[in-house]
Structures are given as structure tokens and as C-alpha cells.
Amino acid sequence: MNRREWMKLAALFTGAGSLPLLQACGQRHAMQPDAPLRIGYLPITDATPLLVAHSRKLFEAEGVVVEKPVLFRSWAQLVEAFISGQVNMVHVLSPMTVWARYGSQSPLKVLMWNHMAGSALTVQPGINSVAELGGKTVAIPFWYSIHNVVLQYLLRSNGLEVTESDTPGPRQVRLIVMAPSDMVAALAAKNIAGFIVAEPFNAVAENKGVGKVLRFTGDVWRDHACCVTVAHAHDVERRPEWVQRVTNALVKAQLWTLDHRVEAATLLSNAGEGKYTPH
């Protein structure tokens, strides 16, 4: 995520910045009170329940009309589409929901956790400890993310401090916000020393030989939250039975995934029928 994307996302989470989009969302809802389920997602495993439920027609089994999920490449694009009503259900980083709710008064509701843990700190092959990140740059998916919290805890536990300076000192680590889909390429180009993010990008880096997993976030903070599924508050308030049916499908998707992990991985990949991700 470049500075322009960051500023755009920050603006979306202020009252003034989000007002036109919220008005557009209200108009959409007035015109389509029974709108179909429109899912927006990033190509990361955090979207699993949404995509599994779509692929296995679990929404239809609950009587919910659903359109094909729409892939977005950045959090800014995803959040803008949600606030404006282009999509009416997305997964977002859990701390981001607090920022959205109290920063812009965005009328959203958290329906469920998408998963626990499931992320990792991946570094260049020559780095063997957290302490070796001193003087280097590490990418995070967003400031308001569990990834940022876990990483800063790890760094401080190893005597390092965080900075945004372009020239970090030997006991400092520069953190930058970057879209997950850009992280592997940045690591391969040695523009960053590491990144902390959800799968599949940690596995992609290892498979390409450009990085290795140094720590799993679940080993630092057991069963931590990561992404959550959110809906528009007006859907929850005005058609609660519809939201319940959607939630039922998502729960069934979670349960199926727990018992069919290999099948779920194939389903989510570019080899799957839905081709939900480019991986």
C-alpha cells in the first residue's frame, strides 16, 4: 500500500471522508431493500468462510441469493466498496472495525470471527532471529491490525523499537504499510527484510525461495483474532432473518473447512473451479 492508498483509507474512516459514500449506500439500500448478497474480499485465507460458502452453495441452501464474490487488491478498495454499498458483506482486520465504527461512525456490524491465528512473520532467508531485524524494514498489512500488535510485541521483547524513519538505527525497525499481494515481490526485490501477514503469502515466499517463516503469530498470541466478517447495520436491523441465514451458511462453511482442509485449499486456489485467488 503506497502513501496515496493509506491516505485514501484514512479518509474513509473519518466522518467527512465517508459521508458521500454512506449517503450512496443509503440510496442503494432504499432502491434495493432485498438486495442479493454481494461479497467483497482480498485474496487471503481470511476470506475462507465467505468463499467456501459461495463455492459449496451453502448460501443458496439457506435461501439466500448471492452474486459471485468480487476480488479487491487493497484494503482501501475493499472498504470503499463496502461503505458505498457496492458490496454488502466483507472481511476486514478486526481492529479496523473499531476505527471505522468510532472514526467515521460507519454503521457496520461484526457478525463473526473468520479465523484465529493463521498469520506469520516471514523474513529474508539469511535472517535467523527477530533481533536481526534491527536497522531493517518490515511490512505490515495495516496500522490497525493484529499483525502490527503482534509484531511490535515481538520487536520490543527483543530490545527493538519501532520507527517510521527512512533510516532506522541499529536497534530500530522501520514499519511500512503494504498490500498483502505486494509483499512477496517486495521481499524478493530486497525492498523489505520481512513481512507479517496472513496466508498464503508466507507459503508463497517459501515456495519461491525468497523468504522463510520466522515466527507464527499464533505462537506469540494464542488463538488471537484476525479478520472478522462485517455487514451493514441496516441489513442487520431491517432484515435480521436474512442476516441469520447468511450467518448459518458461514458457520457451516467454517465447520466444513475444519474437516476438509486440503479440499478447502484447492477450492480457494487458482486451480479451484471458482478461481477465487491468483495463487
Model feature map: region roles:
Residues 11, 87, 192, 248-255:
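Solvent-exposed alpha-helix faces
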Residues 120-122, 228-231, 235-236:
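Short glycine- and hydrophobic/aromatic-rich loop-to-beta-strand nucleating segment
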Residues 31-177, 189, 193-203, 210-223:
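Short, glycine-/small- and polar/acidic-enriched structural segments
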Residues 237-279:
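Secondary-structure end/capping motifs
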Residues 5-25:
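N-terminal export signals
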Residues 129, 236-237:
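Short beta-strands and strand-coil junctions in structured, solvent-facing domains, enriched
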Residues 44, 73, 145, 181, ...:
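Soluble non-cytosolic domains of exported or imported proteins
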